[in-house]
C-alpha cells in the first residue's frame, strides 16, 4: 500500500546505462558504482529481470553482486504483462527504491510490458526524484524515448534496417544502442540518426557504461568506449533511398569516448578526459577546449 513505502528524495538525477556483458564476478566496477550511486549500505534496489529468458539466474546473479558491494535491501519486480505492470502495488515498491536496475534480454518484451504502464511511470518518477536508474543491454536501450527493438548488424548504414519501439523517455532526444563494437551496430545507429537528425545516437560497448548526470552530461566508465553520433548537419539521401540500400551520410560528427571521458549532452562537446596510466599510476586530466 502507498502508506507502507516511504518515498526517498535524492539529488541529482542519475542514469547508469550499460552496454551489456558487464563484469559481475570480478571487481564488477560498473555494478559497484551502481550500488554506490543508489546509496551503498543505505540503498534499496529493485531488480527488474523481465527482459531475460533466464530470470532466476539473472535475479540470483545481480542479487549476489549488489549484496557483495553493500546493498542491504533488495526487491524484485517482474510483471508478466502490461496488466500486471499497471498494478499500483508495483509502483509503490518502485517508489521506495533508491536504485532500479533493468536486466538484458528481449528489449521488445521489456518495452511492451513497461512503456506507458504504472510501473513504467513509477520508474520515470524515481528518476526525476533522484533514484539511480541502471540498465544493461535491453535495459539500456529502453531508457531513451525511442528504442531499437529489431535491427540488422554491420558497419554500413542502410535504409530501413531497424525497427523502433517506445522507450521510457528517461533520456530524451537520444537513442541508445548497446553491444556496440562487439556486434557491429554502428550502421544501424547511424541509419537512425541520419534519418532522424533531431536524435543523437549513443552506442556503448560491452562492459562499459555512461553515467548520466541531470540529463546534461555523462562520464564513461568500464573497459570499452561510448560513441556519440551527431547528424544534425549531415547530408543524407535517407528520404529517397530504397529499402535496404546503403545510405549516403556525409558530414556526420562521431565522437569515440573511452573511459574517463566526460561529454556535454547540451553542447555535444567533450568537456574533460581523465586517464590513469597503468604503468606509472599517474592520472592525467585533459580539459577540452571550449567551443561555441
Model-identified regions with their sequence ranges:
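General beta-strand structural signal in soluble alpha/beta enzymes
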Residues: 17, 75-77, 101-102, 133-136, ...
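C-terminal and late-domain segments of enzyme folds
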Residues: 2-41, 53-61, 66-68, 147-149, ...
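Catalytic nucleophile loop
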Residues: 102-104, 123-147
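Glycine/threonine-rich flexible loop motifs
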Residues: 107-117
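Portal/gating segments that form or line small-molecule/metal binding sites
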Residues: 46, 52-97, 102, 109
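Catalytic-core regions built around general acid/base machinery
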Residues: 92-93, 116-130
